[in-house]
Swiss-Prot record:
Protein name: Galactokinase
Function noted in UniProt: Catalyzes the transfer of the gamma-phosphate of ATP to D-galactose to form alpha-D-galactose-1-phosphate (Gal-1-P).
Binding site for ATP: G124, A125, G126, L127, S128, S129, S130
Gene3D superfamilies: 3.30.230.10, GHMP kinase, C-terminal domain (3.30.70.890)
EC number: 2.7.1.6
Site feature location: Transition state stabilizer: R28
Family label: Belongs to the GHMP kinase family. GalK subfamily.
Subcellular location: Cytoplasm
Sites where the protein binds Mg(2+): S130, E162
Keywords, in A-Z order: ATP-binding, Carbohydrate metabolism, Cytoplasm, Galactose metabolism, Kinase, Magnesium, Metal-binding, Nucleotide-binding, Transferase
Source organism per UniProt: Salmonella paratyphi A (strain AKU_12601)
Catalytic activity field: alpha-D-galactose + ATP = alpha-D-galactose 1-phosphate + ADP + H(+)
InterPro entries with a match to the protein in the record: Galactokinase, Galactokinase_bac, Galactokinase_CS, GalKase_N, GHMP_kinase_C_dom, GHMP_kinase_C_sf, GHMP_kinase_N_dom, GHMP_knse_ATP-bd_CS
Pathway: Carbohydrate metabolism; galactose metabolism
């Protein structure tokens, strides 16, 4: 039973009438452009074929009822006429409540909804299960009540909910790609203007995501430190963000900067340039150049931004040794564990899977999880 059938069946069973709509919003993986989003830079993610699915129907009152199928059918219920506050014990509820609360501030021309939610985006793997949920919930209200909101506004609404209601700092990339993703394409996103350009993916290439299953511990504190270091760098150049600093300007005065800050700045500037070039390489189907750019990106994250861990570097080395120059691999996500992403010709996927299975656990003592994905469509009815 797929997620649509599962949520529709559960909806009828619990609420006693059929759902009128089923909405999906995908998770994502970022192909290149790491820690560039909060520096007003460029990112190149694609939506993946793992998603949050919500079967739903409008109500004729002001009540919102929600069932979380993946949490033993836990329920939440709240009124649109009372202040929406955080739920004490159900963290998943706060993503739903936060999205609805922030939607009210944007456009409150909507009434109650019944919904059943289920998803298969792996949680804690850095594949944006939370953004997928936020965008799915926003799309439910937009579709059921014909709200005049576009994908970018639904994405911004989800980001606000996560930052201000759930209390977790995040850039805009995750929500934007979930809302605007295009099948068989990646999206080059300008995080300053939120402009997005669809970039066609080469045919016969798989998007492979491998979770190192190394438990991330430093990610929160170190993420904030990196942001501060980048802001320090921007201030040094008297610019609003590192997006506005050229590599030439940086190289001319790099020795005057604090050495650690200089390394952080060099990563962001070089990564921005790589991301823009990667979009063009991908569009031309030049997997060899894309692979070189991904390798440079990984080295920069390891040596200049210092956010990789030995387990991730091991995983990258195993994949690279197997594919040579026929594709690319790098760490993806915030760092300190998480996943690597690889672009691999489909016929090489079994060899990569076998090499990783034989070597990774033997070298690290941890078993990986292997996902073969396709670039998929953004949020909408399914």
């Amino acid at each position: 039973m797929n997620l649509k059938e599962k949520t529709r069946a559960l909806f009828a069973e619990i609420f006693g009438y059929p759902a009128t709509h089923t909405i999906q919003a995908p998770g994502r993986v970022n192909l290149i452009g790491e820690h560039t989003d909060y520096n007003d830079g460029f990112v190149l993610p694609c939506a993946i074929d793992y998603q949050t699915v919500i079967s739903c129907a409008p109500r004729d009152d002001r009540t919102v009822r929600v069932i979380a199928a993946d949490y033993d059918n836990q329920a939440d219920e709240f009124s649109l006429d009372a202040p929406i506050v955080t739920h004490d014990s159900q963290q998943w509820s706060n993503y739903v409540r936060g999205v609805v609360k922030h939607l009210q501030q944007r456009n409150n021309a909507f009434g109650g909804v019944d919904m059943v939610i289920s998803g298969n985006v792996p949680q804690g793997a850095g594949l944006s299960s939370s953004a997928s949920l936020e965008v799915a919930v926003g799309t439910v209200f937009q579709q059921l009540y014909h709200l005049p909101l576009d994908g970018a506004q639904i994405a911004l609404n989800g980001q606000e909910a996560e930052n201000q209601f759930v209390g977790c700092n995040c850039g805009i990339m995750d929500q934007l790609i979930s809302a605007l993703g295009k099948k068989d394409h990646a999206l080059l996103i300008d995080c300053r203007t939120l402009g997005a350009k669809a970039v066609s993916m080469p045919k016969g290439v798989a998007v492979v995501i491998i979770n190192s299953n190394f438990k991330r511990t430093l990610v929160g504190s170190e993420y904030n430190t990196r942001r501060e270091q980048c802001e320090t760098g921007a201030r040094f150049f008297q610019q609003p963000a590192l997006r506005d600093v050229s590599l030439e300007a940086f190289n001319a005065v790099a020795s005057e900067l604090d050495p650690v800050v200089a390394k952080r700045v060099r990563h962001v500037l070089s990564e921005n340039a790589r991301t823009v070039e990667a979009a063009s390489a991908l569009e031309k189907g030049d997997l060899q150049r894309m692979g070189q750019l991904m390798a440079e990106s990984h080295a920069s994250m390891r040596d200049d931004f210092e956010i990789t861990v030995p387990q991730i570097d091991t995983l990258v080395d195993i994949v690279k040794a197997t594919i040579g120059d026929q594709g690319g691999v790098r760490m993806t996500g915030g760092g300190f564990g998480g996943c690597v992403v690889a672009l691999i010709p489909e016929d090489l996927v079994p060899a990569v899977q076998q090499a990783v299975a034989q070597q990774y656990e033997a070298k690290t003592g941890i078993k990986e999880t292997f996902y073969v994905c396709k670039s998929s469509q953004g949020a909408g009815q399914c």
